[in-house]
Design a protein with these regions (language model features):
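Short amphipathic alpha-helix with an adjacent loop that forms part of the alpha/beta core around
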Residues: 46-50, 114-120
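A cross-family acyltransferase "interaction/gating" segment
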Residues: 89-90, 104, 136-221, 225, ...
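Catalytic core of membrane glycerolipid acyltransferases/transacylases, capturing the structured
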Residues: 8-28, 35-37, 50-106, 156-157
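Soluble extracytoplasmic domains of inner/organellar membrane proteins
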Residues: 115-116, 123-125, 129-142
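Residue-level preference for the first positions of well-ordered beta-strands
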Residues: 53-55, 124-128, 160
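N-terminal membrane-anchoring alpha-helices
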Residues: 1-43, 241, 249, 253-274
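C-terminal alpha-helix
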Residues: 232-241
Length: 274
């Protein structure tokens, strides 16, 4: 892990300094390498949005979501400002051009303007609207304030929003239940280092990622209605994945090189199931 990180970080620093377009792709390469090291096997359903910019809206179980989603979603994460100061991971977040936000309501408008500016530059953003992580067996209520940027047109067009659900479903090829799923979760007052060490020794892990239908705020009339829709779709997606109701995807990858074509013959239903 450290060797892979030390190898790529200098390249990313140079790419960002000289504004070379590859800087937007390098984080995805790093995440895919980490997936391979930790033996994460990703099962992909649905079709990834080709539109730029797109706001990807995702559920949040653990810091592992960053690695899993970073391997398949071309974009920058939106994270709490405290992450900026984390040893090593704060540096990695900055090198992925993460947008850091504070939880204070007084800064909401400022953060919304910053995120809108990034979208206007053509950057995709990845949002965790729950505002925190959980045990992986459910989806917490979405905070509609995070969807304020979706109310603004980007280059004269409504912003594309794609709900994406991620669920931790297998360990060494065997489906896991409610009691084991929290092994992947990181929430509350859990320490990072012991949890990361535990994950590294768990064996081959399976994650299910579903790309749901792309929507815009115009379809729902308000950011609150859009947030409610995304919450319902993602909740259903997680439920389908952890209960085994999803038909196995045609493609499982250690190194998900072509997520745009994953599970090519199927599209998510309106209910959110793939």
């Amino acid at each position: 892990f450290l060797g892979w990180t030390v190898l790529l970080v200098p390249f990313q620093i140079v790419l960002i300094a000289f504004r070379i377009p590859l800087a937007k792709r390098m984080p995805m390469i790093w995440h895919r390498g980490v997936c391979r090291m930790f033996r994460f096997r990703l099962e992909l359903h649905g079709r990834l949005s080709r539109e730029r910019p797109t706001l990807f809206v995702c559920n949040h179980t653990s810091y592992l979501d960053i690695v899993v989603l970073g391997a398949v979603l071309p974009g920058s994460f939106i994270a709490k400002v405290e992450v900026r100061g984390w040893p090593l991971f704060g540096l990695l977040a900055r090198l992925q051009r993460t947008v850091f936000v504070e939880r204070r309501a007084a800064r909401t408008a400022q953060h919304r303007d910053e995120m809108t500016a990034r979208l206007e530059d053509g950057d995709n953003l990845i949002l965790f609207p729950e505002g925190t992580s959980n045990d992986g067996n459910r989806v917490l209520p979405f905070k509609s304030a995070f969807f304020g940027m979706a109310e603004k047109n980007i280059d004269g067009r409504p912003l594309k929003v794609q709900p994406v659900s991620v669920a931790y479903t297998r360990l060494d090829g065997i489906p896991i239940g409610r009691r084991l799923r929290p092994l992947f979760a990181w929430y509350g007052d859990m320490d990072l280092a012991p949890h990361l060490w535990s994950v590294a020794g768990m064996g081959r892990s399976g994650m299910t990622v579903q790309f749901h239908d792309v929507v815009t705020v115009e379809q729902f009339g308000s950011r609150k209605a859009l947030a409610a829709h995304c919450e319902n779709v993602i909740s259903q997606g997680v439920s389908d994945a952890i209960s085994g109701r999803l038909r196995p995807a045609r493609r499982r990858r250690w190194w998900p090189t072509k997520p745009l074509y994953a599970d090519k013959g199927r599209r998510p239903s309106r209910s959110g199931a793939a």
